[in-house]
Amino acid sequence: SGMGLPFAALLIRPEYDIWKPAEHNGTFRGNTHAFVTARVAIEKYWADARFAEDIAAKARLLDVVLGEMAELVPGSRRKGRGMMQGLDVGSGDLAAAICARAFRNGLIIETSGNADQVVKVLAPLTTPEETLRRGLSILHEATRETMKTNKMAAE
């Protein structure tokens, strides 16, 4: 709902909307509290273009940091877009090691992918930029340290 309550919604262009009322079937539909908080979230965050501009700026920051991280991990690939991105490091063990090191330094971050090989960044859209910068700094350092440790172990 934008305020932490589960909310299912489907946005359809009017020209494609042929459904009748109640044909949209979502797990969290009909949650009155979520509808109320969703309305408040829309009124607060989407009243003008600032929220979208803030999201775009944070997404660009995420792009830059993931690009720097990709340079540290040979063969890695960036995935996703906007504020839903990740770095496919090619190995679930490597992704887990990066996430574990980040956790030890104060950042909770998860993996995804068919072999848990993607270090996934899925920060809330409302994350303050300074908080995002701190988290990405921890993640970048965790990646650098993990790769340094792996390189020394391989030698």
Region roles according to the model:
Residues 1-155:
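Conserved N-terminal phosphate-binding loop of PLP-dependent enzymes in the Aspartate aminotransferase
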